[in-house]
Amino acid sequence: MNSSQKIPWGIQAQTGVLTDVLLGKPDHFRWVPLNSISAVTFANQQPMNYRFDKDTAMRQHQRMVEVYKQNGVRCHFAESDEGLPSSVFTRDSSFMTPWGAVIASIQTPPRRRDYAVISAFYRSAEIPIWKWITADHFEGGDFVIIKPGVTLLGWSGDRSTRNGAEQVAKWMDEMGWEAFIVPIPPQFVHMDAVVVMLEKGLALVCEDALPAYAIDWLDKQEIRRIPVSYRDCVKLGGNLVSLGNHRVLSMAHNLNVNAQLKAEGFEVYAVEYEMFTLGGGGVHCSCHELHREPD
């Protein structure tokens, strides 16, 4: 796509063929305290010999980009900023809707100004910013489109808050969309670690992270579930990306989840990504879908 062409934007669902994705540049990425996942990494650096390696991180991120391109996905990049080392996790700083992008309000201190690089991208790309979160905090990882017209909103208190989720729910209602709000335990960070849509009517779900009424609601929405264990979920086992047409971007350490997906007939592209997962985010955290073809 040359500079004179408009970047496609807008999604009705988080399934369907992914055509355009927003990624962050990892130039200034490093480990900083973000969430319970990165807290465990810092606590175990000596006994587990965890060491951040910049060259490895750059190679792993580039390999992820190559998988997108091999699958026909156009990759767009928000600029890096030395003061925003975690802005590479573009899932959280905004989320796409049919009406334009929503700029998130991130609670964790190292990321509170991620909106600067993300909003700059939308302005330069001439993609409309539909809303800004102003009622406390809500992050893009807690916005899940179950199917066109139906959303699942999460909040843990440590990141997204109930007030933030309710603001998004109000906007959805005004547009004739349903929004179902569910609290999640803080160790899962965001709803996208708990429920990830794979294709129309099919999701990866960590049932241990959800109250029974949320499982009942998914059943009423006719969503078939592939279960993810608690053990795998807290290691970002469900944090993967549907590419559409029965293709999935996953991570190499997701042995159980990848095997389940292959048994379901999915083509699984599993990349090494530990420099980022140890820093608090997986491949789903690292992308933001700008446009998908309808299912």
Predicted regions and their residues:
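The feature marks the mature, well-folded catalytic cores of soluble enzymes
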Residues: 1-295
